[in-house]
Amino acid sequence: MDLGLDGTAALVTGASGGIGSAIARTLAAEGARVAIHYRSNRAAAEELAADIDGVALGADLRNEDEADALVPRAVERLGRLDACVANAGVWPSQDVPIARLPLERWRTTLDANLTATFLTARAYLRHVESTGEGSLVLVASTAGLFGEAGHADYAAAKAAIAHGLALSLKNEVVRTAAHARVNVVAPGWTVSPMTEGELTEETLGHVTATMPLRKVATAEDVARAVAFLASPTAAGHVSGQIVTVAGGMEGRLLHAPG
């Protein structure tokens, strides 16, 4: 199927590695020019940009001024901007129960995930006011759908993205851009640098127990779902939806068998 992305332009945040890098490569393979956002890994972003004929743009999306400037910079470099993928985020690897969760970590996690996504979305919505159309894809997580013990900060941020933020955005954006769409991709456990060292044999058995497909996702699995939602042809009448890429996951296995 032709996704209608040839000749379009997209911005992918958090694209210097992992899922973001796979998203950028997938969109480029469909013919889009891609602005590859990075916060600190400039070398990886520039290498990827060279590989896919894209552009690398650095910004700290927790900083309002830098986030506001990112979309105009992408438009300046690409000449247009049809899609924006708000992928940047951080999963804190250390398990900390809520009763012991420091306020500093709570704030840090929400800033890196929810605030960064809000600022990216706000900047893109300001852009589509002048174009009347576009696709915004927010990357959330199954942690935001089912909760995640030991990572309540991350789960809360991703739940806010997938529900309150996305649903408000899809209703607001059409007031100024009649053909703009907002959707969410919610990956489950995915093989990526962020989960490196976490997916032990024991963990794999535990996390796949509620998945009919009994496997974790690849970054490319997530990227293809994003490309579908970014498509003006395949998903041109799709807005306000959450596409879960988690092998049919139905929830959490809270207790070990037996």
List the predicted regions and their residue ranges:
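Substrate-binding pocket helix/loop in short-chain dehydrogenase/reductase
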Residues: 94-98, 102-110, 207
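Short, small/polar-rich loop/turn modules that mediate ligand/substrate recognition or access, typified
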Residues: 176-181, 237-239
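A short, exposed helix-loop element centered on a Lys and neighboring polar residues
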Residues: 121-122, 167
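Short C-terminal tail/terminal secondary-structure segment
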Residues: 95, 234, 239-258
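Residue(s) in the substrate-gating loop at a strand-loop-helix junction
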Residues: 141
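Conserved glycine-rich cofactor-binding loop
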Residues: 9, 16-17
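Active-site helix of classical SDR
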Residues: 121, 157-158
